[in-house]
């Protein structure tokens, strides 16, 4: 839980801001010069969160891994599910890494150069929380397709009905 003391940090370099944000939540994290990796809890699984800062482009790439590895024989149907899911998203997208079969959510944020590459706490919170929320929202779709015997369309319909019923 973030405290009023945590909100005193108004802006910092993107990796510094994410490091402070993760620390405030008590999440395990590993930091490198232009990269930070953290583990965040979710209701379905824990998420590995990776952020990579490309200073010369002023771009922060953010990845969330929902701990789903797709077997070769299920990839075609999962690609279809990813396409249907991505149609529902305004920001970011899901993809499947062909070399490893790992599913992930990817988003990139351009950090305004006028602020000398600084990221606000609000921007960090929005980036992290929106990635986790989308992973949580669509995790059941991928599970239904992979292990529940549903078609991608059936899985999406079932998952969206289930989430609409939650309070």
Give the residues covered by each predicted segment:
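Terminal, regulation- and interaction-focused segments at domain boundaries
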Residues: 1-17, 65-68
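Short histidine-centered catalytic/ligand-binding loop motif
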Residues: 5-6, 63-71, 117-120, 124
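Ser/Thr-rich, low-complexity intrinsically disordered terminal regions
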Residues: 20, 24-62, 67
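A generic structural motif
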Residues: 36-37, 101-107
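Short, internal acidic amphipathic alpha-helical interface segments
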Residues: 65-104
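Long, hydrophobic, amphipathic alpha-helical segments used as structural scaffolds
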Residues: 90-93, 97, 138-150
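Long, amphipathic alpha-helical coupling/dimerization segments that relay conformational signals between
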Residues: 108-142
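Short, highly charged C-terminal tails/helix-capping segments
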Residues: 143-167
